[in-house]
């Protein structure tokens, strides 16, 4: 008859106190359940290799020393079985108390106290059980760190997504899919870093806190520096700092880091998110499109093995599966904003008439007719953004460059060289969501001042996402910013698509959450 320690009937509190009593009893016997070190020199793969020529119910003469976390514990008569996990490998440990513990009752006491979640070190002989399972027949087991709390099952985690986000350590211990997702995330960031290093970019770090906010149209987080007695903002983007570096002669720079925006939380938005921004002197937005295509298509091939793959996130709340074919083959599709809106709305927007008051009136009227909700203040920027979201973004399933942004939507972008009222800016969308924002950088100081004044007008109208005026940055431009292209890529959403995540919180180790209800 076997006894399993996998599922405890007692309450979590009772289990916790029982485990503490067990550990205190072991410690009273002189057993250190939190040793400083355990020496081991083998891996689970060493065991699998050693057992290749071993038959069922046979032992080799190969000794191993290993460590791992117990994920299942079973007692059958006088033999204890432990399934131990390390990294992505699992291995069975067999401990025969008749053979190993006759002259060492403390050893039996130790192994009988081992439960799921405990971290153990063990020494033994490689072999196979009667059923042919590869095992280590242990003659010594040591508790290296006990798990005092009841160890949840993978089933419990899947049915309770809040537990995943609030207790990521537990999720990673029992949910292999989650572990793999974050391993893939690391590979994605590593590939991006290697790509830019390879083409001659310098990785830099810029401030997270600053007494000004800029670089993107977004609502910032505010904090206070007690010693300096000043308010500081968490950065919404590192753009203005990175362009200062280009002015200073660092002609190819990039930064991978956190940005913060005090805005909504949903399936694809988290207030704290990871992005890469890169700036390249003597390049324009056409060059940036080529870089984005090469970077992302290569990344997709690395992770998925092909430019084409199926994005199929599983929504835990509904268990509904969505299958979205995505194709990152180059060149990416392109859509011009005004051309597409004119076709969809049956109107005639141009770069010349887009800034006229009657154009804003027309767009407000169209939105009312089509029941498109736009929050006040209904600025031209907000109206255009709403129509882009309604008519253009849903067309962008495969990677698509959206181009032709009017000046009012792009205060830091340079005027288009041949289209009045338009900037040399693009956003790249995939699966209807923005992944990339880039443009030929505006490097004319007086024109940049004028753009900031336009943003001031929106701010005075009540737009709390308008970009604030930054005279210091304009003075930086007066030292000479060479023709430059700048680009930002959201890493979290990219990871979502490459790991079949339905929620951005699934690809952020510690996402922003509401306070837990006590």
From Swiss-Prot:
CDD domains, per the entry: LysRS_core, LysRS_N
Any Gene Ontology biological process: lysyl-tRNA aminoacylation
Keyword ATP-binding found: yes
Subcellular location(s) per record: Cytoplasm
Keyword Repressor: no
One MF term in the entry's GO annotations: tRNA binding
Documented EC number(s): 6.1.1.6
Disulfide bonds: none
Gene Ontology, cellular component aspect: cytosol
Assigned keywords, A-Z: Aminoacyl-tRNA synthetase, ATP-binding, Cytoplasm, Ligase, Nucleotide-binding, Protein biosynthesis
Identification of the protein by name: Probable lysine--tRNA ligase, cytoplasmic
């Amino acid at each position: 008859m076997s006894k399993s320690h996998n599922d405890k009937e007692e309450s979590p509190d009772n289990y916790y106190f029982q485990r503490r009593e067990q550990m205190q009893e072991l410690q009273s016997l002189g057993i250190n359940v939190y040793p400083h070190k355990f020496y081991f020199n083998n891996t689970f793969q060493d065991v699998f290799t050693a057992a290749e020529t071993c038959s069922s119910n046979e032992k080799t003469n190969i000794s191993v020393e290993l460590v791992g976390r117990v994920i299942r514990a079973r007692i059958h008569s006088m033999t204890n079985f432990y399934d131990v996990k390390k990294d992505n490998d699992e291995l069975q440990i067999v401990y025969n108390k008749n053979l190993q513990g006759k002259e060492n009752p403390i050893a039996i006491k130790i192994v009988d106290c081992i439960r799921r979640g405990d971290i153990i070190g063990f020494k033994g002989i490689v072999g196979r059980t009667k059923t042919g399972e590869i095992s280590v027949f242990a003659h010594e087991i040591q508790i290296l760190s006990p798990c005092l709390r009841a160890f949840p099952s993978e089933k419990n985690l899947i049915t309770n997504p809040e537990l995943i986000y609030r207790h990521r350590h537990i999720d990673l211990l029992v949910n292999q899919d989650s572990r793999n997702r974050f391993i893939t995330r690391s590979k994605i960031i590593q590939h991006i870093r290697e790509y830019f290093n390879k083409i001659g970019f310098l990785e830099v770090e810029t401030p997270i806190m600053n007494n000004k906010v800029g670089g993107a149209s977004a609502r910032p987080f505010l904090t206070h520096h007690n010693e300096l007695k000043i308010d500081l903002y968490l950065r919404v983007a590192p753009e203005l700092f990175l362009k200062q570096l280009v002015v200073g002669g660092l002609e190819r720079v990039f930064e991978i880091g956190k940005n913060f925006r005090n805005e909504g939380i949903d399936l694809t938005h988290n207030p704290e998110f990871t992005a890469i921004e890169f700036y390249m002197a003597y390049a324009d937005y056409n060059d940036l499109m080529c870089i984005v295509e090469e970077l992302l298509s290569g990344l997709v091939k690395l992770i998925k093995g092909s430019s084409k793959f199926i994005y199929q996130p599983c929504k835990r709340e509904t268990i509904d599966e969505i299958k979205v074919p995505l194709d990152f083959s180059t060149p990416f599709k392109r859509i011009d904003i005004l051309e597409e809106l004119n076709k969809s709305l049956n109107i005639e927007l141009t770069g010349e008439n887009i800034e006229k008051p009657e154009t804003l009136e027309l767009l407000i009227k169209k939105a009312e007719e089509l029941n498109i909700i736009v929050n006040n203040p209904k600025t031209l920027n907000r109206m255009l953004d709403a129509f882009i979201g309604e008519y253009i973004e849903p067309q962008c399933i495969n990677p698509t460059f959206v181009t032709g942004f009017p000046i009012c939507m792009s205060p830091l972008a340079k005027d288009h060289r041949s289209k009045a009222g338009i900037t040399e800016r693009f956003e790249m969308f995939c699966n209807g969501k923005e992944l990339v924002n880039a443009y030929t950088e505006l490097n004319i100081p007086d024109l940049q001042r004028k753009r900031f004044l336009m943003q001031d007008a929106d701010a005075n109208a009540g737009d709390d996402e308008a970009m604030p005026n930054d005279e210091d940055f304009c003075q930086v431009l007066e030292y000479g910013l060479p023709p430059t292209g700048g680009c930002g890529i959201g890493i979290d959403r990219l990871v979502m698509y490459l790991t079949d995540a339905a929620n951005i919180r699934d690809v952020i180790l510690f996402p922003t959450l509401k306070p837990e209800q006590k």
